[in-house]
């Protein structure tokens, strides 16, 4: 039976590539993002089954997502918390309070909200997989990336704690930690590209691999580097 998969930030980058990978795997794919026009275009391109606009930083939107999934499908098998972004990449002293709050909300709070929203459903099912997308900034940091790195480190450690809470219910929680890849986020941050760097499809394959493991097996976290990287992924 096809799995029901929900992916946030699915209009581009990792999210869009992940939606395509699950769809090609024969799963039923729900795609969400803020920009409905871009989302609908991406959904048509990859053959997604359902698309709806949502703000992952708004808990009420998560409540509506749970309601929609429950009414249409009755369950959720895989949740991919992919939505995120830099908001601002600069020295901490240059951040406004609003930019700090926005960075933490988009990259950390959104993941917590998503896992909280679908936790009860997956507990009742006694199965399910939550996959949260972090960043290598969770493991090491560089000047101007401090606030973003703090949020992504939070995602990594939140995922570890969430797994311990969900494990007794046969629900898996994993964290994927990607290096820089060829996405819109990279371009917006002014990061150069190389022929050997990661592609969104590489992260999508990693996410799909984790989800395809037998329910008895769980990947706690996995870091994916491009072969062109050594110590500094940027």
Predicted regions and their residues:
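Active-site helix of classical SDR
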Residues: 115, 151
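Substrate-binding pocket helix/loop in short-chain dehydrogenase/reductase
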Residues: 90-92, 99-104
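The beta1-alpha1 cofactor-binding region of Rossmann-like NAD(H)/NADP(H)-dependent oxidoreductases
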Residues: 54-64, 97
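C-terminal helical subdomain
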Residues: 168-171, 175-176, 183, 192-232
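Conserved glycine-rich Rossmann-like NAD(P)H-binding loop of the short-chain dehydrogenase/reductase
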Residues: 25-41
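Residue(s) in the substrate-gating loop at a strand-loop-helix junction
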Residues: 135
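Conserved glycine-rich cofactor-binding loop
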Residues: 11-12
């Amino acid at each position: 039976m096809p799995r029901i998969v929900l992916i946030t930030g699915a209009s581009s980058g990792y999210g869009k590539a992940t939606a395509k990978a699950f769809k090609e795997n024969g799963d039923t794919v729900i795609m969400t993002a803020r920009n409905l026009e871009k989302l609908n275009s991406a959904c048509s391109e990859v053959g997604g089954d359902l698309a709806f606009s949502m703000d992952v930083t708004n808990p009420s939107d998560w409540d509506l997502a749970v309601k929609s999934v429950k009414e249409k499908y009755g369950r959720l098998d895989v949740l991919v918390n992919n939505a995120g972004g830099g908001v601002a990449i600069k020295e901490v002293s240059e951040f406004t309070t609003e930019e700090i709050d926005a960075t933490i909300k988009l990259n950390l709070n959104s993941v917590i909200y998503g896992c909280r929203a679908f936790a009860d459903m997956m507990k009742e099912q006694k199965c399910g997989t939550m996959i949260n997308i972090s960043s290598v900034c969770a493991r090491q940091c560089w000047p101007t990336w401090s606030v973003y790195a703090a949020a992504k480190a939070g995602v990594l450690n939140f995922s570890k704690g969430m797994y311990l809470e969900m494990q007794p219910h046969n629900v898996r929680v994993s964290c994927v930690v990607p290096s820089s890849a060829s996405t819109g986020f990279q371009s917006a941050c002014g990061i150069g590209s190389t022929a050997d760097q990661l592609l969104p499809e590489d992260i999508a394959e990693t996410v799909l691999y984790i989800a395809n493991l037998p329910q008895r097996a769980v990947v706690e976290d996995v870091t994916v580097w491009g072969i062109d990287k050594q110590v500094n992924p940027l």
